[in-house]
């Protein structure tokens, strides 16, 4: 993921637009657009220690780990 895919802040409306392919998702916060770009990338770096299932976002792993509470 690079500056080309993230875009830049506009001087008029402070929008950031995803430049990936034909996707034009727009947000005002850089961390939101970088989080969004993960939907375009097949990487899943957050792995569950209990079952090995992998997730793109740490918050998704955290939610998943709670399902193992009864294990």
UniProtKB/Swiss-Prot annotation:
Domain of life: Eukaryota
Main location: nucleus
A cellular component annotation (GO) from this entry: nucleus
Alphabetized InterPro entries for the sequence: pacC/RIM101, Znf_C2H2_sf, Znf_C2H2_type
Subcellular location: Nucleus
Pfam families with a match to the protein in the record: zf-C2H2
Keyword Zinc-finger on entry: yes
One GO BP annotation of this record: positive regulation of transcription by RNA polymerase II
Keyword Hydrolase recorded: no
Gene3D superfamilies: Classic Zinc Finger
Any GO molecular function: zinc ion binding
Function summary: Transcription factor that mediates regulation of both acid- and alkaline-expressed genes in response to ambient pH. At alkaline ambient pH, activates transcription of alkaline-expressed genes (including pacC itself) and represses transcription of acid-expressed genes.
Family (UniProt): Belongs to the pacC/RIM101 family.
Listed name of the protein: pH-response transcription factor pacC/RIM101
Gene: pacC
């Amino acid at each position: 993921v690079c500056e080309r895919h993230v875009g830049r802040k506009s001087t008029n409306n402070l929008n950031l637009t995803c430049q990936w392919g034909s996707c034009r998702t727009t947000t005002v916060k850089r961390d939101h657009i970088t989080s969004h770009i993960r939907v375009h990338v097949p990487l899943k770096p957050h792995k569950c220690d209990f079952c090995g299932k992998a997730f793109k976002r740490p918050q998704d792993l955290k939610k998943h780990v709670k399902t193992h509470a009864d294990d």
